[in-house]
C-alpha cells in the first residue's frame, strides 16, 4: 500500500519562529548554491551528451554553500509523522553517511530525504543559475510590493540515484523572502521530495517532472486544486497555505537539452502569469540559458485574410447563442500558426500542433468570467487537450458535462475553470466557404447552473438550433479534409510519446466509461443534441448516388450561400453520460454535391431506407400513422410531448411515414402557396406514395366535361363518400366543400410567384349540413348526364385526398386552407401591382435589416413590393448593385425563411400582423452562387 506524505505539523511556538527567522534566508544574496562538477567539460567536449550521466555526482571536493544546508534543515521544522508511523518513517529515511540515497519503493517516484552532504555542481552553470535567480528575485520583489504576494523561487535538477534518474531541489539555488515562515517551511518540505525524470515514466512525475519531461511550462491559479497523484506536496501546500505556482523548463541554448526546472511558488491565487513567465525567460536569457518562448501580444491580430473575413459572422453566431441561452462565455480557437500567435508553450516542434483563441472573435457575456477568457488567451492548447483540443484532433464535436473533472494533463485550464465556476462546455469544429481549408472551433460554456443531464441535453439541442438560424457560410468539416489539408498532422504526436499516450488514452477511457462519477464523455452531437446536424443526416436519406433532394425537411435550407453542406455517412453510436443516461453520437460524415433540384425523393432507394431502419429506435417503430393522426390538431411540440419523444425525433418519425410537414402549423397560417398546400396533402398519405393535385385535375380534364357543362348536381350515397365536391364559382364563398376551378390548367405551378388559374380551399362544414349525418355527402354539379362508372372513376381519384383531409375538417372546424399565391377568389383578386400587400397592411411595419455587424431600421412603405424593399436595403448598407444578396425574414417559429418575391413579402406581413409584432427582422446574406429555384422558399416540417 502506497504511503502518503506525513500530515502537516502543529503550529510552532514563538521560540521556534524566532529561531527560523534567524536562519539568514532572506534577500537576493541569501541564495544557497552548489557546484555542478564536470558540466563545462560535458558541454564543451560532448555536444550530444547523455543527460542520464550528466547529473551523476562526481568525486569532487565538497561544495561550499552560502549557508550550511544541514544546519538550516535542523533549524526548520519539518512535518511530524503521524502516530504510529515514527519508527517506519525513520527506518525508511536514507542514511546521511551513505554514498547514495536509498529510495523507498513504497513512495513510487518521490521520497523524503535529508540534505546530502555532497552534491557535485558545475561552477559555471551554478553561477549562471544564481545570477538568474537574483534577477528573478529583484523583479519578484517589485511585484510583491504591488500586492502579488510573497514568493519562493527554487530550481529542480536531474540526478541519478541507483538506476533511476530523479529531480531534486536539495542543495540547489533558491530564493525566498525571509519574512515568510510558510514559504521557508515549504522550501524545507520540497527538499525532501524527488520526482521521476525518466521520459518512459507514466506516473509519479509531479509538477517538476511533467515540466521536465514534457518540456513545456505549467501553471495553476491554486495548487490546492491538484490531486495527490498530480501534486504529491498538496497536503503540505494546503497546510502552509500555498496557492499559485508556475514552473518552466531550463534549456541549454545550443543543444536544447533540458537542464532542469525553475519553480515559482506564491501565497496568493493568480490567474495571469504572463509577467512572471516573461520575467523568468528574460533572466535566463541574460545568463545564456533559455526557457520556453515568451508570449506574444495577447491581442494579436489575425493575419490571415480569410479568417478576418469570417470574424463578423462568427461574432454574430457567438452573440446570438450567448444572448439567447444566457451563456457566460463563447470563444473561437484556431491554430496558432494561422494567426502567427506565439506563446510560452511553443517550441519549434509543437508550434504547428498548438491552438489559441482569436480574441477578436470571443464573446464574454458574464463579466465575472473575463479572467478565465484572459487565461485561455494566454494558455494555448495542444491537440487532444480539453474539448477544444479533442475537437481539433478528432474532427468530432466534443462535449463535457464538467470540465473541472479533467486532470491537468487532460485539460491544462481545468483549475481556472474551477476557480471561475464553469462546468459544462461543448466544442464544434467548423469551416466556412470563405476560409478554404482553414478550420476553427467554437467553444461554448453552458450556464453555471446547468448541471443536470437532461437540462444539458436540452440546452445543446437549443444551441444547435440557434446556430443553424444564424450561420449562413458555415459547414461541418469532412474527416478526409482534416487529414489531407488541415493544419495538424495527426500521425505525429504533439507531445513526447509518454505524454501523448497519457492524454489520449485517458480521454478514450473517459469516452467509453460507463457510470464513472465525475468523468467526462466525448459526446458527439445527435438528433437530441444537435438538430441542425440531424437535419443534414436525414437529408441524405432522401437522395442516392450523390444526388440529394433539395427539398430538405424541417425547415433546413441547402443553398450554398447558407454554408451548411448536405452530409451523409454519419455513424451513430451510443455514449454513456456520467450518470448512465444514453446519448447518441456521430463519428464522421461525407459531403455530397447538390447536382439537381428535385421536388421529391426516389422511392426506390432501398439501400437508404435500410440504413435508416437500422438507426430507428424502439420508440420510433411503435408510433404508427394512426397514432400520429390523433395529434395532428395540435402543434408539433405538443404532439412530441404527448408521445414521449423530442420534437426532432417526432420529425423523423413523420418522414418515415411520408409526412414532410406537420399539418396544423400550416393550417393556422393564411396566405400560403398552393405548393405548400400540396405538401400538406402529400404528407398524410403514407410512405407508399402521395396524392398529387395535378393528377386530380387531370381526371377532371380527361372526361368529356367542360366548364360550361358542370352545372347540375349528381348525388352519391353517403356510404361511398362523406364530403361534397363541386366546382368553385369566383363570386361564391367555398364552405364545406373540396373544390376545384379549372380553366385549361392540368397541374399546379410549383413557384409561388407564378400565377395560376387554379385555387383550392377547404373550410369547416356548416352545422346545417352536419345535421344530416356525421359528414356531408359528395355532390358534383353538372348539366349533362353521365353514367355511374364515370362518376366512380372521378371519386376514386379524389378519395385518398378526401379520406385524409376529412380529419382536419372534423378536428379543426374553424381552420381554413388557402394558397399563398392564390387566395380564395371570393376574398381576393389576383395579385396586381401589390394591391394585396397594400390591403394586408393596416399600418406600416418597421424593417430591421441585419448585415454582418451592421444594423438599420426603417419603415416599410405601403406601396413597396419585394424588389423595392430589396433596393432600399442594398442602398442603406452601401452594397454594390452587382452583388447578389439573399433576404430572409424571421417567422413566428424563429426560423429564417427566404424572401424572394412579392408573395413571400405578403406572407411575411401576415405572419408579423398575426403575432402583433411591428418589427420585421430581415437577414441580408451575400450570395455565393445563384439559388436553385429560390421561389420554393423554406420547406419542410418545423
Curated annotation (Swiss-Prot):
Record-annotated PB1 domain positions: 844-927
Assigned keywords, A-Z: DNA-binding, Nucleus, Transcription, Transcription regulation
Major site of localization recorded for this protein: nucleus
Residues that span the membrane, as ranges: none
Chain spans, region Disordered: 1-32, 77-106, 594-620, 723-753, 759-778
Any one Gene Ontology cellular component term annotated for this protein: nucleus
Entry keyword annotation includes DNA-binding: yes
Residue ranges of every copy of the RWP-RK domain listed in the record: 609-690
SUPFAM superfamilies registered for this protein in UniProt: CAD & PB1 domains
Compositionally biased intervals (Low complexity): 743-753
Pfam families referenced in this protein's UniProt entry, alphabetically: GAF_NLP, PB1, RWP-RK
Biased composition, class Polar residues, residue ranges: 597-609, 765-774
Compositional bias of kind Pro residues: 1-11
Residue ranges, compositional bias (Gly residues): 21-32
SMART domains in the cross-refs: PB1
PANTHER family: PROTEIN NLP4, PROTEIN NLP8
The protein's role, per its UniProt record: Probable transcription factor.
Protein name: Protein NLP1
Native species: Oryza sativa subsp. japonica (Rice)
